[in-house]
Curated annotation (Swiss-Prot):
UniProt keyword Ribosomal protein, yes or no: yes
Protein name per its UniProtKB record: Small ribosomal subunit protein uS8
Pfam families with a match to the protein in the record: Ribosomal_S8
Coiled-coil residues: none
GO biological process: translation
SUPFAM superfamilies noted in UniProt: Ribosomal protein S8
Keyword Ribosomal protein part of the UniProt annotation: yes
PROSITE patterns in the record: RIBOSOMAL_S8 (PS00053)
Assigned protein family: Belongs to the universal ribosomal protein uS8 family.
Subunit description: Part of the 30S ribosomal subunit.
An MF annotation (GO) of this entry: structural constituent of ribosome
Length: 133
């Protein structure tokens, strides 16, 4: 079986484990992008922590869940947004968040993976890859 979008599989694994009330989720295969997204989720308080497990193949992440995630997923198609668009928060981005100040959009920017709030502070745009609330 071919995995086309490992980030989408990781977000689905987290969402399914949260809905089932599990204390942890196993994400495989691992990647740098998934690690960066997990760091953001940990920093913002959505997950308790994560660890990398080297299994000799692709590696895995064990994610400790806190029960704070209501919805999580990837944004398809991955659309680029400029700083001006991000400041206005157009309708095609607003639909991924629960309300005005609830939730995060995760962007891939030239300065690394960050939340939409960090991108607004740094006045840069990027590609919207995921959302969480």
């Amino acid at each position: 079986m071919v995995m086309l979008d490992t980030l989408a599989n990781a977000m689905a694994a987290i969402k399914n484990a949260e809905m089932r009330g599990k204390g942890e989720a196993i994400i495989m295969p691992s990647s740098k992008l998934i690690a960066n997204v997990l760091r953001i989720l940990e920093k913002e308080g959505y997950i308790g922590g994560f660890e990398y497990i080297d299994d000799g193949r692709w590696g895995k992440f064990r994610v400790k869940l806190l029960g704070r995630i209501n919805d999580i997923g990837v944004v398809k198609p991955r659309t680029p947004v400029s700083y001006r668009e991000l400041a206005k928060m157009p309708e095609h981005l607003r639909k991924y968040l629960a309300s005005r100040d609830v939730g995060l959009l995760i962007l891939s920017t030239p300065q690394g993976v960050m939340t939409h709030r960090e991108a607004l502070k740094r006045k840069i745009g990027g590609i919207v890859i995921a959302y969480v609330y």
